[in-house]
C-alpha cells in the first residue's frame, strides 16, 4: 500500500531567496535577521519525468527569432533593447500609485495582448482605460490563479501578457497566501518556464518595500530577464523608468514621462524639466549629469547666511552631506 505523501518543509529567506532545511534566526547566506519563513509543498511521485529535453545546436539551428513587439512608447522600447522580445519576462517595480497599472494599459494601446488584473475589478480597469482613451475591445481578465491565467493565454494564443501584480498571483502548487515569499518564488519560476517554452512575453508589475526594493525574495529579480524601477519625486508629476537589470540591452538607461489626465507623455528633451527662470544667477549653477545614455541638466542652488558661531553649519537637500564637505574642502 502506497503511503500518503507528506508536505516537505523548508525555510525561505525573504532577502536573498536561499532555502534551508531548518529555521535560523539569522540567514546563514546574507546574515539578515528574522528573514526566514516556512515554505511547504507537496512532493511529486518518485521517478517522475517531464520527458527528454529538446534542443538544437546553435550553428545548425534553423530557429528564427520573432520580431520585437513595439510598445508604442519610444523611450520604453529603448530601455528594453528595441522592444519586447518573445519569451521575455520583464518586472516593473514601483510605489503604490506611481502609475504601474497605467503604464501596462499604455502598452496595450499599440501592442495586442492580455491584461490580467488581480488588484482591481474589471469595472475599475475599464474606467481607467476609458480615461486613457483606449479602444473598447481590450482583452482584460480578472484573476489571481496562475493555472487559470495560463489556460486563458493558451486559449487566446496570446504572445504578450501583462500581470498586475505578482504579489496578488498564486499557485496551488505551494501553500501560503498570495504575496508570501514561497508563493512569489513559485509563481515567478512557473511564469519564466511558461514564457520560455511558449515564446510568450510577460510584463509584470511588482510592489516595493519601504527600503525601495521589490517585495519578495531576491530570486524574483534573479529569475526574470529585465528589472525596471519606476521612480518619482513626490512633489513632481514626472516619472522615471530606470533599468537595473537587462539581458537584452544596456542597464542604467532612463526614460522620462509626464503623468497627465490622459496617460503618460514622453519627455524627449530633458532640458524642459527645469523651470524657466533665472538659471545660472547668483547662488545657482547648472551641470550635466550622465544617466545611462542621456545627459540630464541639474541645477544646484546655494544659500549662504552669516553665522555668529566659530564654525558654520552646512545642510544639504537631495545631496549627501559628506559630498558637500568634500567640495567645500576642495574650494578652501
Where are these regions (language model features)?
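Detector for small/aliphatic-rich hydrophobic stretches
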Residues: 2-9, 14, 19-90, 105, ...
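Short hinge/gating elements
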Residues: 13-17, 61-63, 94, 171-178, ...
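Terminal-proximal interaction/regulatory segments of ATP-powered molecular machines
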Residues: 20, 320-332
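Conserved P-loop NTPase
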Residues: 28-32, 36, 42-46, 51-56, ...
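Conserved inter-motif catalytic segment of the P-loop NTP-binding fold
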Residues: 95-98, 102-190, 307
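Residues immediately C-terminal
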Residues: 168, 193, 210
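Substrate-engagement module of ASCE P-loop NTPases
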Residues: 182-203, 207, 223-234
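Short regulatory helix/loop adjacent to the ATP-binding pocket of P-loop NTPases
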Residues: 213-223
Amino acid at each position: 500500500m502506497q503511503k500518503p505523501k507528506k508536505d516537505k518543509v523548508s525555510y525561505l529567506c525573504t532577502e536573498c531567496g536561499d532555502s534551508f532545511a531548518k529555521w535560523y534566526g539569522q540567514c546563514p547566506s546574507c546574515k539578515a535577521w528574522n528573514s526566514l519563513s516556512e515554505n511547504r509543498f507537496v512532493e511529486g511521485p518518485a521517478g517522475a519525468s517531464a520527458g527528454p529535453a529538446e534542443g538544437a545546436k546553435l550553428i545548425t539551428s534553423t530557429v528564427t527569432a520573432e520580431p520585437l513587439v513595439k510598445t508604442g512608447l519610444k523611450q520604453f522600447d529603448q530601455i528594453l533593447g528595441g522592444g519586447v522580445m518573445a519569451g521575455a519576462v520583464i518586472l516593473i517595480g514601483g510605489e503604490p500609485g506611481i502609475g504601474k497599472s497605467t503604464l501596462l494599459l499604455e502598452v496595450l494601446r499599440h501592442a495586442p495582448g492580455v491584461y490580467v488584473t488581480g488588484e482591481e475589478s474589471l469595472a475599475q480597469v475599464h474606467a481607467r482605460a476609458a480615461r486613457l482613451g483606449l479602444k473598447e475591445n481590450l482583452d482584460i481578465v480578472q484573476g489571481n490563479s496562475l493555472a487559470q491565467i495560463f489556460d486563458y493565454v493558451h486559449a487566446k494564443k496570446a504572445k504578450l501578457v501583462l500581470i498586475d501584480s505578482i504579489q496578488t498571483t498564486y499557485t496551488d502548487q505551494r501553500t501560503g497566501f498570495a504575496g508570501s515569499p514561497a508563493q512569489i518564488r513559485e509563481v515567478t519560476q512557473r511564469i519564466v518556464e511558461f514564457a520560455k517554452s511558449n515564446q510568450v512575453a510577460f510584463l509584470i508589475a511588482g510592489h516595493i518595500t519601504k527600503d525601495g526594493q521589490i517585495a519578495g525574495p531576491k530570486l524574483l529579480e534573479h529569475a526574470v530577464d529585465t528589472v525596471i524601477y519606476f521612480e518619482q519625486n513626490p512633489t513632481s508629476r514626472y516619472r522615471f523608468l530606470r533599468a537595473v537589470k537587462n539581458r537584452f540591452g544596456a542597464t542604467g538607461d532612463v526614460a522620462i514621462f509626464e503623468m497627465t489626465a490622459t496617460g503618460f507623455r514622453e519627455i524627449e528633451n530633458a532640458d524642459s524639466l527645469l523651470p524657466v527662470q533665472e538659471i545660472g544667477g547668483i547662488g545657482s549653477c547648472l551641470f550635466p549629469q550622465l544617466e545611462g545614455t542621456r545627459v540630464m541638466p541639474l541645477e544646484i542652488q546655494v544659500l549662504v547666511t552669516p553665522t555668529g558661531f566659530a564654525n558654520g553649519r552646512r545642510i544639504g537637500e537631495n545631496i549627501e552631506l559628506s559630498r558637500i564637505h568634500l567640495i567645500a574642502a576642495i574650494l578652501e
